[in-house]
């Protein structure tokens, strides 16, 4: 959808402006770097960063786990499951309406149930592609996906865009090689800039408004699609006609 494409581009532009160019608003509301904010050289990143920021490995900020492997003949309870095709056919938000349903024992499923603040990352197929779930209730993730659980939930939106830098290139921080698969070790080893909490809080206020608008657009689009399909069915069955007057 064009509106959501524009909204997603806006969110990415905000992230880049604040955390790549470092022109987040300073205490006076002016762009930090452009207004002469203090910068220091970071040897890990080989670039300057704001003096009030730090750099740590992603593994210190999140827990990672691989998804569930299952067979079709298992018995137990029904669960929704996120597959790689759900990631590849979406942008940043997943609404769950197209998820498959599988049956597995609860004792097996409980280690793979997604939580509200989890981030999901494709291991293969579209390696490095990163998504958020609108609702994680009773939803598992498949073995070709890695789940990233931030230790601090307020960092989730920021970390999503840090991880989305993998999309397309999947370059490691050490060798810059292009990966066919993404592993937990690759993700844990990523060097991540950690902004001050008050800056993250300001970022969240804006990004959550954008996400809310994207969600509304998704709902509106699905409602219109449903109405269109129902009308087409009536037309095909001769139960409705188009007035040409």
Model-derived features with residue positions:
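Glycine-anchored helix-breaking recognition loops at helix->coil/strand junctions
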Residues: 4, 84-87, 142-146, 162-222
């Amino acid at each position: 959808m064009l509106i959501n494409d524009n909204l997603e581009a806006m969110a990415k532009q905000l992230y880049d402006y604040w955390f790549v160019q470092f022109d987040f608003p300073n205490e006076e509301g002016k762009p930090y770097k452009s207004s002469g904010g203090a910068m220091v050289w970071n040897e890990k990143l080989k670039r300057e960063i704001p003096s009030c920021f730090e750099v740590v490995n992603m593994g210190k900020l999140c827990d990672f786990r691989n998804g569930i492997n299952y067979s079709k003949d298992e018995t137990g309870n029904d669960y929704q499951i996120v597959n790689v095709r759900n990631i590849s056919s979406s942008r940043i938000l997943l609404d769950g309406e197209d998820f498959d349903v599988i049956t597995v024992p609860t004792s097996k499923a409980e280690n793979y149930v997604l939580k509200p603040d989890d981030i999901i990352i494709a291991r293969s197929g579209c390696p490095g592609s990163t998504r958020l779930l609108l609702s994680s209730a009773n939803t598992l993730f498949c073995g070709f996906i890695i789940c990233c659980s931030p230790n601090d939930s307020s960092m989730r939106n920021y970390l999503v865009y840090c991880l989305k830098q993998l999309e397309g290139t999947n370059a490691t921080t050490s060798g810059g090689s292009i990966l066919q698969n993404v592993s937990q070790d690759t993700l844990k080893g990523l060097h991540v800039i950690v902004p001050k909490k008050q800056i993250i809080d300001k970022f969240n206020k804006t990004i959550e408004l954008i996400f809310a608008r994207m969600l509304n657009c998704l709902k509106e689009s699905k409602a219109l699609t449903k109405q269109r399909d129902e009308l087409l069915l009536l037309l095909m069955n001769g139960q409705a006609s188009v007035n040409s007057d």
